[in-house]
Amino acid sequence: MEESPIKFADIDINEILKTLPHRNPFLLIDRVKNIRADYSGIGVKNVSFNEPCFQGHFPERPVYPGVLMIEGMAQTAGVIGIKSVEGTEKPRAVYFLTIDKCKFRKPVLPGQTIEYHMRSIGRRKTMWWFHGDAKVDGVVVAEADVGAMLTD
């Protein structure tokens, strides 16, 4: 199957800050790359030991929380959705609505980079559904289907 054309090659942190309302410590993606015309793209999260979550998860063996990976998927999907409709619609917010088929496969450790491979699996008016695979070094560490709503 032929890949659809790239609409946005690289969205850096400055552009993400203009696109999403999330801020530190709850902005959980560092950039989004390869947003395609088929509403797919890849979010990137560089996991640092300095993240607040590692103070309690877990002090003796730090593991990046799975729920934060799911939120990272949702934030990536939000950027893809908003950027995909820019110019035709002007959404001001995106709300995370559903999580389905969520699985955590391997732990993510400080120093690793997570890539959130998101692709649209459906859209109806302002509702979007995405399937996501979180990968570290090409290996799936988590997966889920997420739903979101773009609002004006």
Curated annotation (Swiss-Prot):
Transmembrane segments: none annotated. This is 3-hydroxyacyl-[acyl-carrier-protein] dehydratase FabZ. The keyword Transmembrane helix does not apply. It is found in: Cytoplasm. Keywords: Cytoplasm, Lipid A biosynthesis, Lipid biosynthesis, Lipid metabolism, Lyase. It catalyses: a (3R)-hydroxyacyl-[ACP] = a (2E)-enoyl-[ACP] + H2O. Belongs to the thioester dehydratase family. FabZ subfamily. GO terms for cellular component: cytoplasm; membrane. HAMAP family: FabZ. Its EC number is 4.2.1.59. Coiled coil: none annotated. GO terms for biological process: fatty acid biosynthetic process; lipid A biosynthetic process. Involved in unsaturated fatty acids biosynthesis. Catalyzes the dehydration of short chain beta-hydroxyacyl-ACPs and long chain saturated and unsaturated beta-hydroxyacyl-ACPs. InterPro entries: FabA_FabZ, FabZ, HotDog_dom_sf. It holds the Pfam family FabA. The active site is at H57.
